[in-house]
Design a protein with these regions (language model features):
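Metal-dependent nuclease catalytic cores that hydrolyze phosphodiester bonds in DNA/RNA
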Residues: 1-106, 113-127, 137, 150, ...
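Metal-dependent nuclease catalytic regions and adjoining charged, substrate-binding loops involved
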Residues: 2-7, 135-292
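A residue-level signal for conserved active-site and pocket-lining positions in enzyme catalytic cores
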Residues: 36, 67, 132, 190, ...
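Broad hydrophobic/π-residue packing in well-ordered secondary structure
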Residues: 40-42, 109, 125, 132, ...
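Short, well-structured alpha-helical interface segments that form or flank functional binding sites
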Residues: 93, 124-131, 185, 264
Length: 292
């Protein structure tokens, strides 16, 4: 991967964030398994052509630094332990931040946005935690609980004072119990995903199915019932049919279509430029400057 330095960051920082391949050949990490098949394959095939800018890696660097600090603290738990299990031709891997052997609690440190807490968007963390728990069970260690300790990098004391439903501290803890049924479902999810990835590798870049709506962080198109002279919508509907009915009932004058977005494709996918779905559906055409 090529690391650019558009903001002229110190070379020491650029050297630190310059990426090496996340997965060794033939391995899939717990976090990689959460990505779409298309992203996984394109990232692997085009790794040496991908670009990232050093300035975009500031927050991931904070996360790395925090993990490093916590790893060095002395307690009875073991930290940054790697586990792996062979599944067909792939080795599934995971690195556990902290494991309390006495209480069988797995802990993971996160640096994230306050909005993740506000939206209650923890499905990916749960899948990651259960994958770790499954890996550990295959290696002879039981996990009764997964606990994610999140540092909220954009927390605002002012907002916390104003809004009782806003996270009141810059730390949030998400945890859940691990059941045998969870582990069985996790193994099935992992094996199904690996079969899907294996099939995707047999196809050309453009022939691989697009990532799912969930994997693209896609939002649906909405239909806003508007009224002349009013800035905000009378109502925002999920379909044009509902919007037309609301327009008639509420005295609206027009319907404003608000297209859905694939937010990960637009702003966060590292291999978007090699993806035909991104090129055809997300990428905005370049504007041509006409000489005066």
């Amino acid at each position: 991967m090529i690391t650019t330095n558009k903001m002229h960051m110190p070379q020491a920082f650029v050297n630190f964030v310059s990426n090496t391949r996340h997965n060794a050949p033939g391995t899939l990490s717990a976090t990689t398994l959460l990505q779409g098949d298309k992203q996984i394959v394109l990232f692997d095939r085009h790794f040496d052509e991908l670009e990232q800018d050093a300035a975009d890696l500031v927050w991931p660097t904070f996360g790395t630094a925090f993990h490093s600090v916590m790893e060095k603290q002395n307690d009875d738990a073991f930290k940054e332990e790697a586990f792996s299990v062979q599944v067909d031709r792939w080795k599934v891997t995971g690195r556990v931040d902290r494991y309390d052997l006495e209480n069988e609690v797995l802990e993971d440190w996160k640096t994230t946005s306050v909005w993740k807490v506000i939206y209650g968007d923890f499905k990916d963390w749960k899948a990651q935690g259960l994958t770790y728990a499954w890996l550990m069970k295959q290696n002879g260690l039981n996990v009764q609980k997964c606990r994610f300790v999140a540092l909220l990098k954009d927390h605002s004391k002012t907002e916390a004072k104003r809004k009782p439903d806003y996270p009141q501290k810059p730390v949030f803890i998400y945890e859940f119990d691990v059941t045998e049924a969870d582990l069985e479902e996790t193994e099935e999810r992992i094996r199904t995903k690996i079969k899907s990835i294996t099939e995707a590798y047999k196809l050309g870049d453009d022939d691989i199915a697009p990532c799912t709506d969930e994997e693209r962080w896609a939002t649906a198109t909405k239909y806003a019932v508007m009224k002349d002279g009013r800035k905000t919508a009378l109502k925002v509907c999920d379909s044009m049919t509902d919007a037309e009915a609301c327009k008639e009932a509420m005295g609206g004058t027009r319907i404003e279509v608000r297209p859905g977005e694939s937010k990960k494709c637009a702003d966060y996918c590292p291999c978007a430029e090699f993806c035909n779905f991104y090129r055809d559906n997300v990428k905005k055409p370049e504007t041509e400057t006409v000489p005066m």
